A protein has these predicted regions:
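N-terminal secretory signal peptides and thylakoid transit peptides that target proteins
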Residues: 2-22, 26
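Compact, glycine-rich, soluble single-domain proteins
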Residues: 31-163
Length: 163
């Protein structure tokens, strides 16, 4: 083959390979998990703040989380409930928006948090102590609400929901 025909053949393969990746990504997104919806309240020294949440309870839901979302309402989030306290590590793979993460104990108390997780990062974000759940919210929410270790997340899962 000449250099030109080799170049065209490589270009054609690259385009076909790229199309296959796009088709696979589209198929993967078409099979995204769905999430039950709920409400919770974050209580800090600044007050009580209601949030509309989605619940990630199954392994497929937890693996997907907020991946591929382009936006999240200011008073929205996702609660990952692992059922019992354990070491938890999260990452931001395929997550397009920066997030804050609150790590929560059985009683709803915040035991740790991570602010401004970087979109698309593969770095592990780990709890310093075992936690039962993780609440993901928009980056800046922890600072805006003044969240501190020991603050309370009220939700039926923790047996402390507010009426």
């Amino acid at each position: 083959m000449s250099i030109i025909s080799e170049s065209r053949a490589l270009s054609r393969r690259a385009v076909l390979g790229g199309a296959a990746v796009v088709a696979f990504a589209g198929a993967a997104r078409a099979q995204l998990a769905t999430f039950a919806k709920g409400k919770l309240v974050i209580e800090t020294a600044k007050g009580k703040f209601p949030f509309d949440i989605e619940l990630a309870l199954s392994p497929p839901q937890m693996m997907q989380g907020l991946m591929f979302r382009r936006a999240l309402a200011a008073d929205a989030g996702m609660l990952f409930d692992y059922g019992s306290p354990q070491p938890i590590a999260m990452w931001m793979k395929n997550t397009l928006i920066p997030l804050d993460m609150m790590f929560i104990a059985n009683d709803g108390k915040v035991v740790d948090f991570h602010e401004r997780a970087v979109p698309m990062s593969l770095d592990a974000i780990e709890t310093k102590v075992p936690a039962r759940a993780v609440l993901e919210v928009n980056a800046g929410t922890v600072a805006r609400l003044g969240v501190q270790v020991g603050d309370t997340v009220h939700h039926i899962s923790f047996g402390n929901a507010l009426s």
